[in-house]
Amino acid sequence: VMASSCVPYGFMPITIDKKYLTEEYKNCPNKPEVPKLIDGGVYDNQGAHKLSQNKSKFHTDFIIVSDAGNSTISANKTTNIFILAMNTITLMMDRVKKMQRANNLYESYASKEHFAYVPLEWECSTRLIQGFVTNLKDGNVHPDVWQAHTITEGEITNLKGAESKVAQETTIEKVKNAIHWSELEQKIPLQESEHIARSVGTNLTALSHKEIESLIEHSAWLTEVQVRLYMPMLLTKEM
């Protein structure tokens, strides 16, 4: 939300100033692009596409998508041509974003990068684990991910069988142990904090200290859970 507030509609991405870089990018052998703040402006919510294109110079194998978009679309004042245009842009961006998310998370893992999504709209609860197990059953999780959780092909097959309910409960408990859910559960943000985080609008209004802290709490917890679920191979054994 804070990043989106920095780049209003119609503006190009902001290039990170040289003084914030640890080394000169022109000296790097693979000539990477200088980092840019792309969440906002003409590239709002479109960043994940470039990162997952095989021939893109931005391509990467592990992608964590922090989605703090919080725009609401209302029919109020749609007779105003400016508001109507803004609502049209917002609706288009929301559809593109959700299509990308559905393709990256809820379709077959074959020939795809590893994605972990952190949307502001998702609640901090065990539903994240239930969603992961559903993705397992539907064949949307990379084998190196479920193998890292010590889940077997037989257990995934059982999720589709006659005893699927029992298998689901067993797998949920196994995943909980694998990601150390007991530790994460103690750090779940309060409902009041979640409500404050979701009430922050994506505009040029300055955020209060409480709003910033609420956004950080929600994003930090959700990121830790999603990375433990979908990118366990990036973590050390002692989490």
Regions found by a protein language model. Give the residues of each.
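Active-site gating loop/helix substructures
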Residues: V1-N54, N76, R228
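C-terminal helical/tail subdomains of lipid-metabolizing enzymes
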Residues: P32-E33, L37, V42-D44, K50-I63, ...
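An amphipathic, hydrophobic-aromatic interaction surface with interspersed Lys/Arg
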Residues: A75-L84
